[in-house]
């Protein structure tokens, strides 16, 4: 003997009326929505003067907050661009100036030992011009004016030493230009370190 709902056989004849009632209910709901949305209300719109000042204040605060957030984001973007520009230019200076100075020192050693400087002139000139071109090509408007000026001074000094080697300038003139190169390189690298 079965006890409970399973004991009673199921009837399948009542599904059609239930589905019909469901369909009629959906149609009635749809019609109520259409009729309710198309009804026009008569009258004149009046703002709630008690709430309007609070609304204006809320909108003003929202606009101010949005402007502040936008300003902060722009400052962060500019700082990121500046940091990238500093890193690019300072890395170019550090990477190329070492090779240039090494090649100039090889030229100076050959000169001081009374050897033929011909084999060391070309590499020194090329390294100096390469360093100047690389640093010059890395400069951008995102750099501070002071750092840009220091890097440009190095570029000019490197080219001046390359010209002195190529023109076989006097020892005094060559030394003056090398001193200027060393000073500008040191100043630019010091500013690079301070910028990080």
From Swiss-Prot:
It comes from the Bacteria. The keyword Transmembrane applies. It is found in: Membrane. Keywords: Membrane, Transmembrane, Transmembrane helix. The chain crosses the membrane at residues 20-40. GO terms for cellular component: extracellular region; membrane. It is a single-pass membrane protein. This is Uncharacterized protein Rv2240c. It comes from Mycobacterium tuberculosis (strain ATCC 25618 / H37Rv).
């Amino acid at each position: 003997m079965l006890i409970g709902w399973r004991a009673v056989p199921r009837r399948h004849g009542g599904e059609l009326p239930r589905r019909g009632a469901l369909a009629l209910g959906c149609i009635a709901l749809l019609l109520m929505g259409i009729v309710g949305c198309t009804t026009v209300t008569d009258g004149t719109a009046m703002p709630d003067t008690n709430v309007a000042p609070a609304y204006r204040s809320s909108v003003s605060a929202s606009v101010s907050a949005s402007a502040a957030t936008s300003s902060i984001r722009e400052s962060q973007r500019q700082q990121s661009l500046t940091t990238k520009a500093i890193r690019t230019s300072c890395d170019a200076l550090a990477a190329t100036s070492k090779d240039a100075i090494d090649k100039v020192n090889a030229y100076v050693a050959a000169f001081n030992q009374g050897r033929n400087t011909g084999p060391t002139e070309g590499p020194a000139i090329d390294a100096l011009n390469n360093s100047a071109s690389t640093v010059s090509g890395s400069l951008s408007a995102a750099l501070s004016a002071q750092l840009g000026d220091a890097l440009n001074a190095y570029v000019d000094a490197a080219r001046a030493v390359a010209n002195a080697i190529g023109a076989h300038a006097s020892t005094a003139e060559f030394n003056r230009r090398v001193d200027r190169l060393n000073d500008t390189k040191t100043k630019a690298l010091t500013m690079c370190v301070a910028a990080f």
